[in-house]
Amino acid sequence: MYTWDAEQYKQSSSNQKKWGTELVSKLGLKGNEHVLDIGCGDGILTAEMAKILTGGLVVGTDSSEEMINLAKKNFHEKDYPNLSFIVKDARKLDFDGEFDIVFSNACLHWIIDHAPVLQGIKRSLKGGGKMLAQMGGKGNAAEIVRITEQLIKSERWARYFNDFTFPYGFYGPEEYKAWLTDLGFKIVRAELIPKDMVFENRQKLAYWIETTWMPYTQAVPEHSHEELIGEMLPELL
């Protein structure tokens, strides 16, 4: 389990928020649905859905206690009575037919084995419910993956990565179609959608590396984080 700096993530996740807002618009919410948001992070998108769901509710879950604490701080229940946040691992969902929609943005690629996640989503949905999820897919961030994998084999860093395995679950449509079909889902769309990431400045790119690539940065001593990130930055600018 990784330790998230929730405030830093908030500063470096504008791309994820943009894509998530686009995804929410595709839900076609009527306002009375019960929605589960898996990997809600700082809760911004979850709160946006709560504003629409005047006759419904939304539950945001995240495995990071730091993220959930920030979400609760920013979106208090007295202002959002139909919104709640829970610390919960996406692989251990224990809801039973409670939701019309399960939504997830920029989360599930943090998990290698998606089978327990998809099984939990299936159990969480009411009959006729739907799932809409967006995540890093096959070939995602190929250039930074190449740079990082090369870097950790260098003499300077290799000692920290002796037992390191690639930490992300980047899967393609064919794998997902097979998994969803086995669970009885009717597939409307399962596809790879190219996205470009743009950062306002060097510092926000550094923040993004620190958070999004934390399996690498947290593998080295804390005092070496800036050095590792500093070696990655020139290749990405």
Where in the sequence are the language-model features?
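A short SAM/SAH-binding and catalytic strip from SAM-dependent methyltransferases
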Residues: 101-114
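Class I SAM-dependent methyltransferase SAM/SAH-binding core
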Residues: 34-38, 42-92
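A short glycine-rich, Lys/Arg-flanked "PGG" loop and its adjoining helix->strand segment in the class I
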Residues: 115-130
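Conserved catalytic/acceptor-binding region of the Class I
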Residues: 130-199
